[in-house]
Amino acid sequence: MGLQALTIEAIAARAGVGKQTIYRWWASKTDVLLDAFVDDALSGIDPQDSGNLEKDLRRHLTNLSKFLTQSDAGAVFKALIGQAQNDPQLAEKIRVRFTASQRQADCLPIVKAIERGDLPRKTDVDAIVDSLVGPIYYRVLVSGAPLTPAFIKSIVEHFLASIKT
Amino acid sequence: MGLQALTIEAIAARAGVGKQTIYRWWASKTDVLLDAFVDDALSGIDPQDSGNLEKDLRRHLTNLSKFLTQSDAGAVFKALIGQAQNDPQLAEKIRVRFTASQRQADCLPIVKAIERGDLPRKTDVDAIVDSLVGPIYYRVLVSGAPLTPAFIKSIVEHFLASIKT
Amino acid sequence: MGLQALTIEAIAARAGVGKQTIYRWWASKTDVLLDAFVDDALSGIDPQDSGNLEKDLRRHLTNLSKFLTQSDAGAVFKALIGQAQNDPQLAEKIRVRFTASQRQADCLPIVKAIERGDLPRKTDVDAIVDSLVGPIYYRVLVSGAPLTPAFIKSIVEHFLASIKT
Amino acid sequence: MGLQALTIEAIAARAGVGKQTIYRWWASKTDVLLDAFVDDALSGIDPQDSGNLEKDLRRHLTNLSKFLTQSDAGAVFKALIGQAQNDPQLAEKIRVRFTASQRQADCLPIVKAIERGDLPRKTDVDAIVDSLVGPIYYRVLVSGAPLTPAFIKSIVEHFLASIKT
DNA sequence: CGATAATCGAGACGGTACGTCGTGTCTTATC
DNA sequence: GATAAGACACGACGTACCGTCTCGATTATCG
């Protein structure tokens, strides 16, 4: 069931390789996955910027939703994040290798909006981005509720409304 | 490292019990944990209501943060949620046994505010609650960023600002 | 495989009886078998005596052969004797409950012949009987060689020849 | 109590070896014993031949008695033969690996005597050897009666007397 | 004839050993 | 000289039975 169904012996056998060769290059099963996952996952991150904050946010959150729920990489990500709950070292590795880059993309629409002057200079980017992507991750990892366009729309609208004041 | 360091044999030995007795009553290691966890976790949920939405939200989110980061039950919850990423059946069990109740408590401040007339009848409770608790879970499960009072304050203020319009 | 495939739980279940009821009356699995076996095994022993030593011996050894190789009781006997190699107490019980009676029957032709005066008074009955039945048991328990009429004839003839001198 | 007191786990532990290593090389507990037993048991078989049939037979039967009742290998042999009563495959293995060689030694005095001309060419070696060793095995495996020099002497004398005619 | 035991089936219990699987390390034989 | 193949010590798995121990339900005995 999940990661423990994926044995090192099976990986080696499937690769037509001795176990030792695996151990020579990776310290653990999760490291193998992390390496295999990071490359194609990072390539899927979109650095687009249309100049329209609402549009950018909706597109970005939609892409994030699709990554998490529909892509193979997203499935691996969930598996790794799951494993990381029991393994702080893995958690750190995921952050360094993947989450940091993903985070930059998450921040991009906000940062660009600040540069444009659409948002005030003193905006707390971190808190805002967490408020935008947090609900997405929550539904994926915890509640299992579906990520509908309406939900994404609601997140973005609440955010935009909150900064109108 | 986490759940696989907790063997059934150790559980049985520690309980002064034969392995078979564990297997007789629980189908898996996670079921044992789920049973042991649910009782004391649910008891920690607070149904308080002061009549002040902002105050209630901050208190509730603060309690949630403490549960997730500082309590034993929270640690078990993280481990279970982690395992659930590889195991849809476990995910479902967690929702039925625990998340559902937790969710009710999460919704309470909003529901009460609606009853009071502080929020409009047509408020989408689910989307709003996800937006409030989502960022908390995100930091705990994914980013590892700290749950400061300032962060909680920021979440609540953005929400309140968004509904002022 | 043999006796350890016959579990107490299976015996109890097959008899529609609680395990405790078995344990109340028998101390061990072999005791159950011993009881079940002794009755019908003893009833098969023939105390006939025709007055003709050769004829009696051949008939007796033939019967013994059939008992050991063709009857259900013989199969149980082999199983019990097998178990007894590892269990002196069982060995003793088998002797008291069964082998002793069997032995009397084995001795009968010789004893009768002595009474008749066909054999000298000082005949060592035990040694002679062992020499007669020993080869039979040897083939059954050890060598697996078949118990042909010719073999039985050979045993008897050698014995009769040996006492002619 | 015998073989079931000798667990695979104990064998492995005593050998400072993982259980798997045992299972890799032997299919069952009895196979382990058989291998361990055969080597030193075969080495104890004596191919001596003095040219005197009576002397050779007495010496051989005496050695056989000592092997069965006084040596460690004899104890293992009895345990294996016991187990073999419930396990035809084991019975066959014992015959191939051990009994066959033992049998050759058992036959030797008779065969040599025939070569010497002390016994007729048409002698039925198998039947005779069974008659000689059968009583020994019978006392060991079934009756438990002691193997005295007098008993062995009686066996040999009866045999020699029977061929005098 | 109804209360009171004794006996029984059922099966949970603390244990022990089973045979299997996967781990990470070490060795061999091949290319 | 690197590598596939796989043996090795180890430890947890989930299963099967062991012999002991409660449980009701069902009999049988006696008041």
What are these regions (language model features)?
Chain A
Residues 1-31, 35:
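Helix-turn-helix
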Residues 25-27, 94, 98, 133, ...:
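Tryptophan-centric aromatic hotspots in well-structured domains and transmembrane helices
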Residues 31, 36-37, 69-93:
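Amphipathic alpha-helical segments used for helix-helix packing
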Residues 37-43:
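Short, basic, alpha-helical segments at the C-terminal edge of helix-turn-helix-like DNA-binding modules
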Residues 45-77:
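Hydrophobic alpha-helical connector segments
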Residues 55, 71, 75, 88-115:
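Amphipathic alpha-helical packing segments from all-alpha helical-bundle domains
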Residues 59, 100, 108-115, 131, ...:
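C-terminal peripheral helix-coil segments that are non-catalytic and often amphipathic
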Residues 93-98, 115-130, 149:
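All-alpha amphipathic helical-bundle segments outside canonical DNA-binding/catalytic cores
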